[in-house]
Amino acid sequence: MSPRPLIELQDITRSFGEGELAVPVLKGIDLKIWPGEFVAIMGPSGSGKSTLMNILGCLDQPSAGQYRFNGRDVSALDRDELARLRRDAFGFVFQSYNLLPGMTARENVEIPAIYAGMAPAERHARAERLLTGLGLGERLSHRPAQLSGGQQQRVSIARALMNGGQLIFADEPTGALDSKSSQEVIRLLTDLSRQGHTIILITHDPDVAKVARRQIRIADGELVEDTGAEMPSAQIPETDQNGRRHSRLGDWQEALKSAVRSLHSNLFRTALTLLGIVIGVASVITMLAIGEGARKDVVDRISTMGSDLLLVRPGGPDQRGGRWSVTTLVPSDFKAINEIEGVLAAIPELTGGQTLRYSNRDHSAEINATSFRFPVARQWPVVEGTFFSAQDEASYAAVAVLGKTTANALFPDESPLGKHLMVNNVLFQVIGVMDEKGASPMGQDQDDVVFVPYTTGSLRIFGQTHLRNITVAVADIDRMDEIEALIHDTLMARHGIEDFTIRNMASLIETISETQNTLTWLLGSIAAISLLVGGIGVMNIMLVSVTERTREIGIRMATGARAWNILQQFLTEAWLVSAIGGLIGVVIGIAATRIIGSLGTPIHMTLLPMALAFGCAFATGLLFGFLPARKAAHLDPVHALASE
């Protein structure tokens, strides 16, 4: 069986442009190259030799004709299959070396093996062995800028051999070197040819071309001279598949390393990109904490009145006039409500402002004439002394229980228990002090108050019996709506008309909580705009990065990177920026929230807003990083390599 050519071209043409503007660069090229040959393709600038090499190296596609590699029709291969072919069978040695400046010599050599899925230990050892064999054993950790031109070209040759290098394309490999380095590179290529590698050398220098056993000359896109093929006698090296255990996890690990290296290479730009994400995340966390703190503060204030309470007030829903001028609630109403099953306590309240006097001190406070069951109904305990009793209420006793603010105002340096104070020219004995309650939902001081028996207050202070409101404590909060309906029916039966209103504190708390939640999320939405702006910043920077690194993308594609590998690399950079920015934003958001809280603003931090803000930052990075990453993945290898 006769040997099969490694490369077979039939009537290959390549034109740039379309229609009448099309410019032919290659015209009907027919060519066979056998395994193990050392071929020099010569021609002046503009002859089409570099275009031919790009087609042979699967960096470009012919406009017409057929290209077979090792018997396989290359035109039938998709982008990823072409990438695998470049990775496993080809090696490129470029005139400008095309080494990645941010990577060491060994890391540059390892690139093809990374995309082949070779195990890290295996590829480290192989790269070191290749570089040592090329006289660079002491330059493994040097970056391209620290190497001479000849040394950089040897690194390029080692990279071409990393996956076996069955076919090596050398495009003007001596064009940027001095004579000594040029001779060294030519010697290396000759040695590789003797070892069985197929070498295709692109040059315009006849002296360089003489080292090849076969010379092909191209002029004006046509093959004008071919010294003839020579059947190989050397053993043909197979593509090196050792150590290739392709792993998705390994792909992500390498993409992460590359992303860290890329971001570190331009710290200032990375910091500016991070800033948008940091501000966005910190703003969301801070605004939501402030909004939730305000909501919780209002709800807590209302809850201090008791969430199991129903407030019955005089005046119908449509009745005009102030509540204080309406006299529709009377003592018999609260007694009737007390008889309803499920009512823990119904207490009357008759309130109004009065001036108190003790010794030479005057103080204005609210007087609340109420029932002895007030502490139970309002869940407001006495901390000193005792509350007045049913007997005190029945006997019209002149006793008083003070709120904390009132007690501190009238008795700053002594205990008020047993002392007497004057209210509306009536002398009351202080028998107790209430626990501190704090501000009401309206911001009023609930502790600036004096409690007296309802009977005493209505007769001796206010001179009236009608009530300002009835507070109803419900035994089972799940029956609030049911008890509210029973109270409504009872009062309707007694009054005949709806000259009262009932307020359900549980419903009020729920309504206010929902309203505050809406405001909280509104604040969060406003803050999220900055997060959106940060995401757009990520996209802008990534687009700039793709433009700046177009040549790097071309180098990676030439060494075997698939579209997925490029997409993965730039997506990883985007989400890494977003993740780092998100974490910093969370820390700053927590710190800012605590500082604001220390200044007296109510705040409430929970894990959900932090997780939400970080998750949004992460998702924003992926979303806005996808377009630049996709653009990078779909670049044409030959155009990317030609980019400056």
Swiss-Prot record:
UniProt keyword annotation of ATP-binding present: yes
- Where do transmembrane segments lie in this chain? 271-291, 526-546, 570-590, 607-627
Give the molecular function GO annotations: ATP binding; ATP hydrolysis activity; transmembrane transporter activity
Gene3D superfamilies, per database record:
P-loop containing nucleotide triphosphate hydrolases
Q: What class of enzyme is it?
A: translocase
| Residue span, ABC transporter domain | 7-245
List this protein's GO terms for biological process. response to antibiotic
Q: How does it sit in the membrane?
A: Multi-pass membrane protein
CDD domains found in the cross-reference section: ABC_MJ0796_LolCDE_FtsE
SMART domains per record: AAA
Predominant cellular place of this UniProt entry's protein:
membrane
Its EC number is: 7.6.2.-
Localization terms from the record: Cell inner membrane
Q: Which family does it belong to?
A: Belongs to the ABC transporter superfamily. Macrolide exporter (TC 3.A.1.122) family.
Q: What is this protein called?
A: Macrolide export ATP-binding/permease protein MacB
Q: Per the UniProt entry, what species is this protein from, by scientific name?
A: Marinobacter nauticus (strain ATCC 700491 / DSM 11845 / VT8)
